[in-house]
Amino acid sequence: MIGSVLTELAAHHWPVLVVDDGSRDATATEAKAAGAAVVSVPFNVGVGGAMRTGFVYAMRQGHDAVVQVDADGQHAPDSVHRLLEALNDADVVIGARFAGEGDYQVRGPRRWAMRVLARALSRLTRTPLTDVTSGFRATGPAALPLFARDYPQEYLGDTVESLVLAHRAGLTIAQVPVAMRPRAGGRPSQSSFRAGIYLLRAMLVLMMAVVRRRSDDAHVAESDSHG
């Protein structure tokens, strides 16, 4: 599965890194055979640790932008250039579903939670966002050192909480509409129950961030009134 994704990416002549997070299958072997650079972590460090590893590697190699692409085939390599182009005007770019392109659908409580998260983050960042849980992302030079140092560890931290982190650092967040493809293989990293728990956790983080922003805004307004 990962071999076919890497073959598609290779057609665009981008340097590709695969972070092998303690897997016990042939991921590293297939990735090397497809021409990708591979960093193998000897034990599972989780999504946050794997992402930090990738960001650190990119900086050490002198790259000024990183695009995250899942190995399950959902993220179309043909859309990568659109995310990179959007970095001309933003520091973090989301490849967004539910933005007028493609027919990707989510139903039930998960869809409700995703809408709530998107609306909350849109208010926090003052930017219209439709898909804050998308892992299809581009990170520019201003965000790279931040994410290499402080990328959130937990599931959904790599999506929702990383956007809160970027916003608090004064970075600009944007999205571009993309069409997601059906999962070509693999299984979700979390069960439905655990995913629900993490969604609630992400919503709590967002609520705290919104309250903090309002407090900061009130403090600025008070300072101005005394100025």
Label for each model-derived stretch:
Residues A37, V41-R60, P77-L156, P182-L200, ...:
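Acceptor/aglycone-binding surface of glycosyltransferases and processive sugar-polymer synthases
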Residues V5-L6, A10, W14-S23, V39, ...:
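Short beta-strand/loop segment that forms part of the nucleotide-sugar
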Residues D20-T29, G73:
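A conserved acidic beta->alpha catalytic loop
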Residues M1-S4, D25-A34, D78:
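Acidic helix N-cap motif at the loop->helix transition within catalytic regions
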Residues P128, E154, L163-R181:
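Catalytic donor-sugar/metal-binding loop of nucleotide-sugar-dependent glycosyltransferases
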Residues H63-Q74:
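Short beta-strand-to-loop acidic/aromatic patch adjacent to the donor-nucleotide binding site
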Residues H12, A33-G35, A169:
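Short, structured coil segments at secondary-structure junctions
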Residues G196-V210:
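A short amphipathic helical element positioned immediately N-terminal to and/or at the very start
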